[in-house]
A protein has these predicted regions:
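Residue-level detector of flexible, active-site-proximal loop/helix-junction positions
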Residues: 85, 157-159, 215
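Structural motif
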Residues: 131, 182-183
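Glycine-rich beta-strand-to-loop/alpha-helix junction loops that act as flexible
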Residues: 186-189
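C-terminal functional extensions of proteins
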Residues: 191-244
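Structural signal for conserved beta-strand scaffold positions within catalytic alpha/beta enzyme cores
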Residues: 80, 134, 151-154, 210
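A short, acidic, amphipathic alpha-helical segment used as a generic capping/interface helix at domain edges
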Residues: 6-10, 60-67, 165-175, 191-193
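Electropositive, gly/pro-rich neighborhoods at or near active sites that engage anionic ligands
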Residues: 1-147
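A mid-sequence, solvent-exposed acidic-amphipathic segment
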Residues: 140, 146-182
């Protein structure tokens, strides 16, 4: 596995060279869906999501998400929790062993922690003169991002339960483009995994990137994660597999 900064450069180079790919990421949150572990947070205040494994509809939605996590394709990359790393909250060996093509695995933290400042500096330049759409919370102020967003596809809180239908809007949007490739940035929790997988299956001509909370400070006018404040994982370098 390349270092975190080299992995970031790998994906940035692909964007610069107009080589489409899909990058979806999952970690301890989606791990709860896989293992039916409840998650109870204040979604209204923090733009996060909850999970009640006693709710039958939520179980159905969780299956859609978790089924998508095993998808593999040549141009599709999964960001996972490191198999053996002191920085990651949970061991990623279970994630790692799901996939046959280990070459298409990367760090779930690729846009944050040790890479956070580089992403803030470099991604706006990489996206310059590109057609960019953003899929994220309706309260996100995308006009405050340090790059132009052509369109904002809005979802609400607990989007993985309430906004599955946005897939059709995204299909129509991507279908209206041929070249050059469009860049879709996703920041909608577990729903991102499902949307990116389904869209890539049908159209491999665009960039589908799970950007997560990397630019939350811009769109919400406040930090939502520890690394935004120089705390938590800020500056910490994932090791992938200790000793290798």
């Amino acid at each position: 596995m390349r270092s975190m900064d080299d992995e970031l450069d790998f994906f940035f180079d692909k964007i610069m060279d107009s080589e489409p790919f899909a990058l979806s990421r999952w970690g301890d949150g989606e791990y709860r869906l896989v293992n039916s572990i409840p998650l109870d947070r204040d979604a209204e205040q923090n733009h996060v999501w909850n999970f009640d494994p006693t709710d039958e509809y939520q179980i159905e939605c969780a299956k859609l998400i978790t089924d998508s996590l095993t998808y593999e394709d040549e141009g599709f990359y999964w960001g996972i929790t490191c198999p053996d790393c002191e920085v990651c909250n949970v061991s990623g060996w279970g994630h790692y062993n799901l996939y046959e093509n280990k070459e298409n695995l990367t760090y779930a933290s690729i846009f944050v922690n040790a890479n956070h400042e580089e992403v803030q500096r470099t991604l706006p330049y990489v996206l310059k003169d590109k057609t960019v759409a953003f899929v994220g919370n309706k309260s996100a102020k995308t006009n405050q991002l340090p790059f132009h967003v052509d369109r904002h596809f809005t979802v609400g809180n607990n989007a993985w339960i309430n906004d599955l239908g946005i897939l059709e809007d995204l299909r129509d949007y991507l279908g209206s483009f041929n070249t050059p490739p469009t860049i879709l940035l996703f920041a909608c929790g577990p729903l991102s995994n499902y949307l990116i997988t389904e869209l890539w299956k049908e159209n491999k001509g665009h960039f589908l990137i799970d950007i997560g909370s990397a630019f939350d400070v811009d769109i919400y006018n406040r930090p939502t994660r520890g690394f935004h404040r120089g705390k938590g994982g800020f500056g910490k370098i994932c090791q992938w597999i200790n000793g290798q």
